[in-house]
């Protein structure tokens, strides 16, 4: 399983049980929204030590001119930090060691996407036709990226644009931003269905990422999250409230018409 998908599952749970014995061990908080730092393979903005500790992963943007040697040097500098690539179309030759691949072209071959050993995330336009939006949940990808770049502040219109996509799919939706959103916006982004933020490293300081990390971990759970955790832990079946056994007895008499 992709490490990214595993982290998304953990984020949905909000808390993880640390290693150890006994039920008294304190459960560690997990950010409800992942934070991935984005930078160009040919640029010099890859994360330094401080930012690495504040990120859940990195996204390396590549182009048709990105050399394999340059990408290998870049990924080596990331150490153990999970990373993925972002290109116009999936490029197997440039994805050695990558946990996931983001691509933008709707003309990508289905044969490429049939490789079960790779995790594909598709970048889609917010302006996508309503009819096409209804089809995205059945596409052979693991999630979607939408972009709001050069936005000074988030507005209700932005939330409605995001909601057109997030409410049309059960798969995780990532939001790509030039700048880190304000703390006041984070709850709205979570509630509208954003699973991860992809934030440009070049535009944001270590201090800004530190504040984001703290704000996400301190974000209160939604009431229905607490209730769902309670329900799911008490019963494996939650769809039907009526658990009466309706299986007919072998000795029941049935009237013949």
Language-model-detected regions and their locations in the chain:
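Active-site-adjacent beta->alpha loops and helix N-cap segments on the catalytic face
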Residues: 62-78, 88-92, 100-118, 128-132, ...
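Short, basic, helix/turn surface patches
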Residues: 85-90, 128-135, 173-176, 221-234
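Flexible, charged surface loops at secondary-structure boundaries
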Residues: 28-31, 49-54, 75-78, 93-97, ...
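Conserved N-terminal beta1-alpha1 strand-loop-helix module at the mouth
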Residues: 1-83, 246-257
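ATP/nucleotide-binding catalytic cores
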Residues: 98, 122, 137-142, 148, ...
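C-terminal helical cap(s) of enzyme catalytic domains, especially alpha/beta-barrels
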Residues: 203-256
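Hydrophobic faces of well-ordered beta-strands that scaffold small-molecule active sites
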Residues: 31-40, 56-62, 79-87, 100-103, ...
């Amino acid at each position: 399983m992709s490490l990214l998908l595993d982290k998304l599952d953990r984020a949905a749970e909000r808390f993880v049980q640390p290693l150890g014995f006994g039920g008294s061990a304190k459960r560690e908080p997990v950010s409800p929204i992942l934070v991935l730092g984005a930078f160009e393979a040919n640029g010099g903005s890859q994360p330094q030590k401080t930012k690495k500790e504040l990120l859940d992963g990195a996204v390396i943007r590549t182009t048709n001119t990105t050399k394999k040697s340059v990408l290998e040097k870049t990924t080596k500098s990331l150490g153990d930090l999970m990373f993925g690539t972002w290109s116009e179309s999936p490029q197997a030759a440039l994805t050695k060691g990558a946990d996931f691949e983001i691509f933008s072209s709707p003309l990508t071959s289905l044969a490429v996407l049939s490789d079960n050993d790779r995790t594909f995330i598709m970048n889609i336009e917010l302006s996508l036709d309503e009819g096409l939006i209804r089809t995205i949940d059945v596409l052979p990808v693991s999630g979607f990226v939408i972009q709001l770049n050069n936005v000074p502040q988030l507005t209700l219109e932005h939330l409605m644009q995001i909601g057109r996509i997030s409410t049309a799919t059960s798969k995780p939706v990532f939001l790509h931003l030039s700048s880190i959103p304000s703390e006041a916006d984070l709850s709205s982004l979570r509630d509208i269905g954003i699973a991860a933020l992809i934030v440009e490293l070049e535009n944001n300081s270590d201090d800004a990422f530190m504040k984001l990390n703290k704000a996400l971990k301190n974000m209160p759970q939604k009431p229905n999250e607490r209730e769902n955790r309670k329900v799911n832990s008490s019963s494996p079946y939650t769809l039907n409230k009526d658990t009466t056994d309706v299986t007919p007895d072998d000795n029941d008499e049935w009237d013949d018409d």
